[in-house]
Amino acid sequence: MSTTIVAGVIQGHLPVILPTRRRARDLGHTTALFRAQTLQCIYLSIEYLYVCSMSRRTTIDIDDILLARAQAALGTTGLKDRVDAALRAAVR
């Protein structure tokens, strides 16, 4: 099995070893990988060598009125700030 070795830390993530794109697709790994994470890949000129950085993106429906009330209560401005503040308050 051919693998791609990603050396060094990429955007704060630990190095990973992944199968080449073609091998991963043949094995059906890309479906599970894409379902679990959003992959941002940089393709290099060497055949099958690519670097992936994983970041999680989630789409959810949020009640706009509740979101505005949370903004006022938490004193935040951006959506990420509101969610982070609410999560911190929940775990206290």
From Swiss-Prot:
Pfam families on file: VapB_antitoxin (PF09957)
Keywords: Toxin-antitoxin system
Function of the molecule: Putative antitoxin component of a possible type II toxin-antitoxin (TA) system. The cognate toxin is VapC18.
The protein's name in its UniProt record: Putative antitoxin VapB18
Species for this entry: Mycobacterium tuberculosis (strain CDC 1551 / Oshkosh)
Species lineage: Bacteria, Bacillati, Actinomycetota, Actinomycetes, Mycobacteriales
